[in-house]
């Protein structure tokens, strides 16, 4: 019975050792892959840094201010365009009214002239 127990314990220990070796190998592979990926990502990050230089905060702030200035100028131009479009519409309306008044005046004169000729 003791021999069976000892054999069983030895078998269990061998299983544990095999399992531990398997886990150690798997962990080592995972750590190696992770390390390689990390290294690749660091290299890629450095390439990106060189390729796309990040502007400092002062320069970014200057760009934002310039953008806002241009937006304000654009808004001012749009309001001027709106004003001139309305003015043009009013002038066209005024011109139409003047044409109507001129025709009415012409009709009055022609009637007046025809009345004075009689």
UniProtKB/Swiss-Prot annotation:
Purpose? Component of the biogenesis of lysosome-related organelles complex-1 (BLOC-1) involved in endosomal cargo sorting.
Specify whether Coiled coil is a keyword of the entry: yes
Pfam families noted in UniProt: BLI1
Q: What is its main location?
A: other
For this chain, the family text in UniProt reads: Belongs to the BLI1 family.
Q: Which terms are listed as keywords in the entry?
A: Coiled coil, Endosome, Transport
- This protein's source sits in the domain of life called Eukaryota
Query: Do you know which InterPro entries this protein is assigned to?
Result: BLI1
Asked whether the keyword Coiled coil is assigned, the reply is yes
> What subcellular locations does the record give?
Endosome
Name the coiled-coil region(s). Answer: 55-104
> Can you say what this protein is called?
Biogenesis of lysosome-related organelles complex 1 subunit BLI1
Q: How does it assemble?
A: Component of the biogenesis of lysosome-related organelles complex-1 (BLOC-1).
Q: Which gene encodes it?
A: BLI1
Mind naming one GO cellular-component term on file for this protein?
A: endosome
